[in-house]
Amino acid sequence: NLKDLLIEPDTAFIKKLKAGETDKKMGIELSIPTFRLAGLNLYKAITDNKINISKILFKDATCKLLMGKKPKKIVKHNDDKEFNIDSIYMKGLDGISIGKIEFLRNKFEIYDLVNDQLIVNNKDLKFELKDFFLEELKGNNDYFRLHLENLKLELLKEEFMVPGGNYNLNFERIYFSMADSILEIDGLLLKTTYNDKYELAKKLKFTSEIYDIAVEKIKISAFDLEGMIKNGIYIIDSVAVKGLHLDILMDKRLPFNTDKRPKLPNQSLKQMRSPLYISKISIEDSHLKYQEKYEGYEEPMTAILADLNAQIHFATSVKDSISTGKSMTVNLQSNFMEKPPLHVNFIFPLDSRADTFYFEGHLASAKMNEFNKASEPAIGVKFIKGDLKEIKFSGSANPEISKGSMTMLYSGLEAEVDKKNTEKDKNIFLCWVANTVVHASNPGKNNKL
C-alpha cells in the first residue's frame, strides 16, 4: 500500500503556464490517497526479474489537467518521443504481467487557468482494465512489446460535465473487449444543464442547435484498435445504434451566423484529417424531434420522425476507397409526424468535385391537419380539412444549387392563413386566396395533375 501520493507542479511553473511562457502544453496534478498492489510475488521479481501482479487499485484518486495560455513555441524534448506499444524501453526487467487495474471512486478534471474555470469534470469514475502484459523482445534486451490481445475495459455509471458547462454527459456502462473487437455503450444521455432550453438559447449569440440525446445502446464491431493507435487509421466494420431519441431545438429569433456554413455529409467526410472507413451504420427503433421557435408564435414549429430506422453504407474518408467511385448511401424509414410512413433514399458520391448528392422518397396517406404543428408556426397555414393521398419527390443538391420535383396527390383541401406580422383584413384575404386560387384537389375534376 502506498498512501497519500501527491504530484503537483510548483507555483512558478503554474504562473508560467498561465501566461504561455513555458514550452509545455499543460500541467498535471495527481492525488492518489490509496495505491495498492495485490498478489505481487517479490521473490520471483528479485530472482527472475519478472513482475506478476494480480491487481492494482487506485482509490479516490483525482487527476487534474491544467490548461494554460497556448505557448508561442512548443519545444519537442528527447523524452517526448511518441509511444510505441511494440518497443517499450525498461531496463533490468524480463517481463510484466498484470491481471487487473481497478479505478474506484476517481475524478478526472480539466481546469482552464487563464479563465479560472473548470472545463470538464466527472462525479465518480469507476472502471477496470483486465488481461494485458509486457513481453521482452527476443534478441533485444530491455525492450518490450505491450500485448493487448485480451484487454478488457469496463466503466460503470458515470457523469461528465461537457466543456462549456451547457451539457452533462451520462452513461450506464461502457464495455470494450480487444479479443472480441467490440465496444458497447449502454444508456448514453446528453442533456442540457438548463431546465428550460430557451434559457440556454439566451446565452447564444446566433441561432444554433440545442440538443437532448438519449441512446439505449451503441455497439461498434470489428475494428482495428492497433491500427488506430499506431497509424491513426479508423477502420470499423459496423456501428449499430438502438433506441436513439434525438431532440433538436433552434431559436430562429436569433440571427444566423453568416460566417459559418455547415458542410454536407460527403464534404465533411472528404475533408476529415484522420482516415475513416465504416462499412455499415444501422439505426433502429429511434425517434427524432426537430423544433424551430419563431417570433410571435407561442408553440415552436415541430417536425417528428417516429419509429425511425436508417442504414448507412460506405462512410469513408480514405482516399483509396473514395477513388473507387463507390458512393455512400443512406436509406431511411420512419413515420412522419408519428403517422404516415416516409421512405427516403440518399446517394452521396464521394469522388465528385461538385459534391452533388441525390435523393428520392415517398410519403403515404394522411389527414392534412396532422401537419399543422409544422405548417402553422413555419408559414402561418392551418389545415382545416383535406386528405393527403401521397407525395413522391426526387432531386439533387450541392453547396451551390438544388433542383428537383414533387408530385402531391390530395383532395378536399381547406386552410386558414394567420400571419402574425399582418393585419386581420390581410389574413382574411389570404385565407380567401388559399381556398379559392389554390386547387382543392389534385388531380382536379379534369383528372389532370
Features from the language model and the residues they span:
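Elongated, acidic membrane-bridging lipid-handling scaffolds
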Residues: 1-4, 42-44, 49, 53, ...
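Transmembrane beta-strands of outer-membrane beta-barrel pores
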Residues: 6-9, 60-62, 107, 189-192, ...
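Amphipathic hydrophobic-ligand
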Residues: 14-38, 50-53, 116-130, 161-173, ...
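Short beta-strands and strand-coil junctions in structured, solvent-facing domains, enriched
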Residues: 42-47, 109-111, 225-230, 289-291, ...
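Outer-membrane beta-barrel proteins
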Residues: 65-67, 197, 248-250, 415-417
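Flexible, surface-exposed loop regions and adjacent strand-edge segments
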Residues: 71-78, 202, 254-261, 378-379, ...
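Extended terminal
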Residues: 345-350, 355, 362, 373-449
